[in-house]
């Protein structure tokens, strides 16, 4: 809930700046058309099913709010630094994720800090139950937690790979320590971070994979990552609660004991793959996204939640907006490296919705 209020506050700041100074390029507004199909499908599903659950209408407004909030932040940072470019903004994002990761570690080490930080934000019933049930079993983020934290930490790893390939790294040692820190803490918060790590690794290896210069440069960085990662993993095995370590690396521990590359989470995910039994659900959905204290149909799989809510139309239209953002961005930036980044991020989003 606190994220929503902060987003609204930043959005109001962005709207105010736009009205006063009109610093937003009006051509960017065209991406909002990508929100219209999913909003219309949401209205149709809510009315036809008589549930009046217009989740994706509110989603559309939240994306517009994020749009203005993002421009407000870009404007503020741009005023403080001359020649502020995309790489600078991506660095700011990475630093914020690093600070969030540090805060998650400190909240685990100091329970009083955890209690204080969570006392100043409001959670819904489902989030509150998840925080209570997992306390002491895994690290908990603040503002960004669980699956959401895994997504953000994974995205930070992908963006850091872009910065490395774009030669925007000054102190490689410090940069690598931050990369490993975000990776390890991200895994301790949500194992979904591993997906982002795999995408960042794929991005790194696929870029100019035949170029001798880049092969040497990438191998040196990967070696450095491995050395620091070994130190980081050794630290958490020595100094963190065994329950947290067992949870974070459960999949690898099971694999080592011939139980397969699985965990309680992946086993539960398999159980969540339930499919609609009626044609009506495939066409217009059931018009429900969340219930009071659990997910509709007890599934947290992204594609299935979209399918049960608004049928195939919502499941397809949901991805029109990110596609239009990427299309508009590609028209602005011609860098092959950046184009590859957008492709990786879009593929990352598609894969995450299987979870």
Please place each PLM-identified region on the residue numbering.
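Alpha-helical transmembrane segments of multi-pass inner-membrane proteins
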Residues: 91-118, 141-189, 194-207
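Long extracytoplasmic/lumenal interhelical loops at the membrane interface
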Residues: 244-313, 330
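Aromatic-anchored transmembrane helix interface
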Residues: 34-40, 52-76, 88, 92-97
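Short, small-residue-biased leader/transition segments that mark boundaries at the very start
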Residues: 1-5
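A membrane-periplasm/extracellular boundary helix in multi-pass inner-membrane enzymes
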Residues: 102, 108-111, 205-257, 277-280
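Membrane-interface helix-loop-helix junctions at transmembrane boundaries of multi-pass membrane enzymes
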Residues: 19-33, 163-176, 212-219, 326-344
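Hydrophobic transmembrane alpha-helices and their immediate junctions
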Residues: 169-171, 198-210, 309-353
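Hydrophobic, aromatic-rich transmembrane alpha-helices
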Residues: 10-23, 155-167, 312-332
């Amino acid at each position: 809930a606190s994220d929503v209020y902060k987003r609204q506050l930043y959005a109001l700041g962005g709207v105010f700046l736009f009205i006063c100074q009109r610093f937003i390029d009006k051509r960017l507004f065209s991406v909002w058309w990508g929100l219209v199909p999913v909003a219309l499908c949401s209205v149709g599903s809510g009315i036809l099913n008589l549930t009046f659950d217009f989740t994706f209408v509110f989603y559309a407004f939240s994306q517009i709010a994020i749009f203005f909030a993002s421009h407000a932040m870009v404007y503020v940072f741009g005023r403080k630094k001359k020649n502020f470019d995309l790489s600078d903004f991506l660095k700011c994002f990475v630093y914020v994720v690093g600070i969030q990761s540090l805060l998650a570690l400190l909240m685990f080490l100091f329970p009083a800090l955890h209690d204080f930080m969570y006392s100043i934000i409001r959670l819904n019933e489902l989030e509150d139950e998840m925080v209570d049930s997992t306390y002491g079993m895994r690290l908990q983020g603040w503002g960004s937690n669980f699956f959401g934290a895994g997504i953000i930490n994974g995205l930070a790893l992908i963006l850091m790979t872009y910065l490395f390939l774009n030669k925007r790294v000054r102190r490689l040692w410090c940069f690598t320590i931050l990369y490993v820190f975000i990776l390890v803490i991200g895994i301790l918060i949500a194992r979904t971070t591993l997906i982002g790590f795999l995408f960042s690794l794929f991005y790194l290896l696929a870029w100019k994979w035949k170029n001798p210069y880049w092969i040497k440069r990438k191998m040196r960085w990967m070696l450095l990552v491995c050395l620091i990662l070994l130190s980081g993993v050794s630290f958490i095995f020595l100094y963190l609660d065994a329950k947290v370590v067992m949870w974070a690396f459960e999949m690898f521990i099971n694999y080592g004991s011939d139980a397969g590359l699985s965990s309680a989470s992946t086993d539960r995910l398999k159980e969540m793959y339930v499919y609609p039994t009626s044609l009506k659900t495939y066409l217009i959905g059931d018009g429900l996204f969340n219930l009071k204290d659990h997910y509709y149909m007890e599934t947290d799989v992204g594609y299935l939640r979209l399918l049960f809510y608004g049928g195939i139309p919502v499941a397809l239209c949901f991805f029109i907006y990110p596609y239009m953002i990427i299309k508009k961005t590609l028209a602005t930036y011609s860098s092959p490296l950046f184009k590859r980044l957008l492709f990786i991020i879009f593929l990352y989003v598609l894969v995450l919705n299987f979870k």
